[in-house]
Amino acid sequence: MDKQSKFRIKTFFKKIIFFLIIFCFFYFFNFIKKTKKITHTTQDKFFELLSKNKINKFIVLNKKKVSFTLNEKKSHLDSNNYNFFSKLHLSRYEFEIGDLQLFQKKIDFYKELYEINPNFEFKNYKIYTVLNFFYDYGFFLMIIIICWIFIFRKIASRSSESEFKFKIGKSKAKLYYYNNITFKDVAGLEGPKEEIKEIVDFLKSPNKYTKLGGKIPKGALLIGPPGTGKTLLAKAVAGEAQVPFFSLSGSDFVEMFVGVGASRVRDLFYIAKLKSPSIIFIDEIDAIGRARIKNNIPGGNDERENTLNKLLTEMDGFSTKTNVIVLAATNRYDVLDDALLRSGRFDRTIFIDLPSLKERKDIMKVHLKKIKFSKSIDLDFISRQIPGFSGADISNICNEAALLAARRNKVKVETKDFIDTIYRRIGGIEKKNILIKKNEKKRIAYHETGHAIISWIIEYAHSVFQITITPRGQSLGAAWYIPEERQITTEDQMKDEICTLLGGRAAEYLIFNNKSTGALNDLERITKQAQSMVKFFGLSSLGNISYFDSTGRNDFSLEKAYSEKTSEIIDKEINKIIKEQYKRALEILKKNYDKLIFLAEKLFKKEVLFKEDFASILD
């Protein structure tokens, strides 16, 4: 049950309690009134008391009955027994009068005889007060009120539903007038920031460009992998320009009702124009911007296409004086419609790549501002351990390292906390309680040592700095490397990487004269590497040809881009590359057989070896 439902139930019961209190209040006072003591007497007794002037007041009810109270004062009462309830229970006397005319004549006679002037009145109706009403009908009235509340709430909910039907076509964008995020909060991304700073300048001083005949860009498309800072960069644009910022996701346009998406697009741009200069940011625009189906296939998403068509017309229908800029982000650039990507809609396409080594260090510095860390922390070493990590990944690493240091009861976060967090992120949680047989443990030690020796010896392999046979995640051991930052990769570098990955299986075969299932991950990676060399990069005897589809639109096609004969050649080339590198790995390990035995036995005993442990031996 959500908080709003709990609040409604709590409010309803408060109302019930309130009505119960009111009912009990009236019931109590009416009960007090009805509990007054009534004494039946005679007419003779009445006139006897009247003659002594002891009657305070009497009332003739419906010409048949007389009700009176005595004129006794508090001093005449027993002071010892007098209390609040005694006062509530003052006696009231009643008697039947019979003939009314005879009774009136007798009253007049006593008035003249005893010279008294009694206080009396005639009432020809039943005494029925508000208290009597609540006493008689209060319970039923309370039930009616409760039912009325239920009905009213139902009508109100129906009314809100009907209002929802009218509001369903309205934009769901969140409007931010002021944003504290600036370009200083966006670490790295120096290239994209420089390109997008011009958009900020357009919003701040558009006349600077329009007076020369230039037109304000209508949109910019941010493209990059998840977590690279596309949304953060868009927020920084709004923060720098200090203009209204409309933020929503592409899926916010999509609804089960026909025509809602187009209506929301229309409403969004209408509001943005009223508040111009402004920025519209559409995250995950591929939800509505996918390429339209050329053939009329049954079951196609016509509603999404209608939404896209409306978005296209709104973006292309901008006036140059509206100062409304559309920013959109996606990690599926390949599936977007060509009409959306053309100039005049998204005039600029900004690619945001995964951060480089320097950018990773800058991102870590931003996230470390809120963390207490040791001054001896090695940011360069940590940054080298996380190639391919996005800004979101680095943020998570910093946070997890702080949590790990807290669990270890440390005052500050140290380098070891970061490294252990990275290992956990890449390899999984360390499994200290898993039982491994001695012969299996020895095989794992030789497997990991084989990786380390080959990566140390061959030229283009990544530098190894630690090997371990401690189970972690789904692996029983691991060799950790410091990857080299590369923008392009040569054929020799790719072959060296394959050779390093085959070093583990080669070491097993060399020592135990058989193979095991422990090389599954290695085999998967080398197969993909060899496939990419042959099919995509043209690094084989097949020639300078590539079957790579950068658009990604033929992923589900049943037709291959090459013949069956070419497919056989590709398979042979892949197999040839892998066999050559496996043979090469065996030769390297045979030449370093003694070192392999020594390091593997040492790893078997210690379970973890660092660069310092095997550097002197391998050098």
UniProtKB/Swiss-Prot annotation:
Enzyme Commission code(s) on record: 3.4.24.-
Residues holding Zn(2+): H447, H451, D522
Molecular function terms, GO-annotated: ATP binding; ATP hydrolysis activity; ATP-dependent peptidase activity; metalloendopeptidase activity; zinc ion binding
Active site feature: E448
GO BP of this protein: protein catabolic process; proteolysis
Recorded topology in the membrane: Multi-pass membrane protein
Keywords: ATP-binding, Cell inner membrane, Cell membrane, Hydrolase, Membrane, Metal-binding, Metalloprotease, Nucleotide-binding, Protease, Transmembrane, Transmembrane helix, Zinc
Annotated CDD domains: RecA-like_FtsH
Segments in the Cytoplasmic topological domain: 1-11, 153-619
TM region(s), chain numbering: 12-32, 132-152
Pfam families per UniProt: AAA, AAA_lid_3, Peptidase_M41
Subcellular location: Cell inner membrane
Required cofactor(s): Zn(2+)
Residues holding ATP: G224, P225, P226, G227, T228, G229, K230, T231
Textual note on the cofactor: Binds 1 zinc ion per subunit.
Topology, Periplasmic side: 33-131
Enzyme class: hydrolase
GO cellular component: plasma membrane
Free-text function comment from the UniProt entry: Acts as a processive, ATP-dependent zinc metallopeptidase for both cytoplasmic and membrane proteins. Plays a role in the quality control of integral membrane proteins.
Protein family: In the central section; belongs to the AAA ATPase family.
PANTHER family: AFG3 LIKE MATRIX AAA PEPTIDASE SUBUNIT 2, ISOFORM A (PTHR43655:SF2), ATP-DEPENDENT PROTEASE (PTHR43655)
Known partners and oligomeric status: Homohexamer.
NCBIfam families linked: FtsH_fam
Name of the molecule in the record: ATP-dependent zinc metalloprotease FtsH
Organism of this sequence: Karelsulcia muelleri (strain DMIN)
Taxonomic lineage of the native organism: Bacteria, Pseudomonadati, Bacteroidota, Flavobacteriia, Flavobacteriales
Gene encoding the protein: ftsH
